[in-house]
């Protein structure tokens, strides 16, 4: 499983990429691999304000449906509609296939997430 440096990871297998006061959020390589071929993606409304732990969207594969949670408090600025049109993009490039770009409400919440090394150890224990 690929784990990229420079990202933050949640125990629910979401990744967060920080660029200034904005964050990109998607699901990890482990998550897409566990789900299998992704056939449907549901994204939040632009402007939605979500707290850490809230459902960000839904990803469905031929074998399972899984809620995607926001790991941090956010306001959704943009959604990646290309994933709705072609959900398999997540299988092909999980770290390039962000689900939302959002305003990060509280940067200190990033400290509760795992860095790449911690996430790799977490996966070994899964």
Swiss-Prot record:
Keyword RNA-binding: no
Record Pfam families: GCV_H
A GO term from the CC aspect: glycine cleavage complex
InterPro entries: Biotin_lipoyl, GCV_H, GCV_H/Fam206, GCV_H_sub, Single_hybrid_motif
Cofactor: (R)-lipoate
Keyword DNA damage: no
N6-lipoyllysine PTM sites in chain numbering: 63
Function: The glycine cleavage system catalyzes the degradation of glycine. The H protein shuttles the methylamine group of glycine from the P protein to the T protein.
UniProt record similarity statement: Belongs to the GcvH family.
Protein name as annotated: Glycine cleavage system H protein 2
Gene this protein is translated from: gcvH2
């Amino acid at each position: 499983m690929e784990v990229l440096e420079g990202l933050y990871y949640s125990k629910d297998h979401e990744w967060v990429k920080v660029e200034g006061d904005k964050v990109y959020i998607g699901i990890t390589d482990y998550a897409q691999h566990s789900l299998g071929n992704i056939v449907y993606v549901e994204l939040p409304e632009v402007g939605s304000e979500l707290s850490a732990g809230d459902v960000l969207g839904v990803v469905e594969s031929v074998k399972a449906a899984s809620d995607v949670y926001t790991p941090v408090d956010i306001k959704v600025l943009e959604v990646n509609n290309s994933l709705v049109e072609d959900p398999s993009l997540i299988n092909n490039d999980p770290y390039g296939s962000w689900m939302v770009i959002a305003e990060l409400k509280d940067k200190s919440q990033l400290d509760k997430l795992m860095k790449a090394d911690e996430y790799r150890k977490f996966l070994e224990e899964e």
